[in-house]
C-alpha cells in the first residue's frame, strides 16, 4: 500500500508526498527532494526525530525511543514506515532531548 505523508516543518510549510509502506519516511522524503535532519540512519539516535500528529507508523526497527516516548507520538523518520496516512512534525530533536 501507499500512504500520504504530510511533513510539517519549522517553517510551517507542509510538505506532502506519497510513501509506500515498505519505504522509510526519511528515504522517501529524500527521493522527493525534501531535506530532513538525520545522522545514524539506524534508529539509534535522535537527529531525525519528529512527532506524529495524526496517523500511524511502524518503527519497530528503531532502538532509541522507549515505549513511553513512542506512546507520546515521537517518531524516528529514518526507521519509520507509514501504516496509514500520516502527519508528522519534523525537526523535533531539541524538544525530545530537552
UniProtKB/Swiss-Prot annotation:
Cofactor note: Binds 1 [2Fe-2S] cluster.
Listed NCBIfam families: fdx_plant (TIGR02008)
A single MF term (Gene Ontology): electron transfer activity
Record-stated family: Belongs to the 2Fe2S plant-type ferredoxin family.
Any GO CC annotation of this UniProt entry: chloroplast stroma
Positions with a binding annotation for [2Fe-2S] cluster: 40, 45, 48, 78
Protein task: Ferredoxins are iron-sulfur proteins that transfer electrons in a wide variety of metabolic reactions.
Lineage, uppermost ranks: Eukaryota, Viridiplantae, Streptophyta, Embryophyta, Tracheophyta
Protein name (database record): Ferredoxin-B
Keyword terms: 2Fe-2S, Chloroplast, Electron transport, Iron, Iron-sulfur, Metal-binding, Plastid, Transport
Organism (species): Alocasia macrorrhizos (Giant taro)
Amino acid at each position: 500500500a501507499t500512504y500520504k505523508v504530510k511533513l510539517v516543518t519549522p517553517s510551517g510549510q507542509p510538505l506532502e508526498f506519497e510513501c509506500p509502506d515498505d519505504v522509510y519516511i526519511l528515504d522517501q522524503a529524500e527521493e522527493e527532494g525534501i531535506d530532513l535532519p538525520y545522522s545514524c540512519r539506524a534508529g539509534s539516535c535522535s537527529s531525525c526525530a519528529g512527532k506524529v500528529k495524526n496517523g500511524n507508523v511502524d518503527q519497530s526497527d528503531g532502538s532509541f525511543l522507549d515505549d513511553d516516548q513512542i506512546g507520546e507520538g515521537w517518531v524516528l523518520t529514518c526507521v519509520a514506515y507509514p501504516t496509514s496516512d500520516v502527519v508528522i512534525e519534523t525537526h523535533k530533536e531539541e524538544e525530545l532531548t530537552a
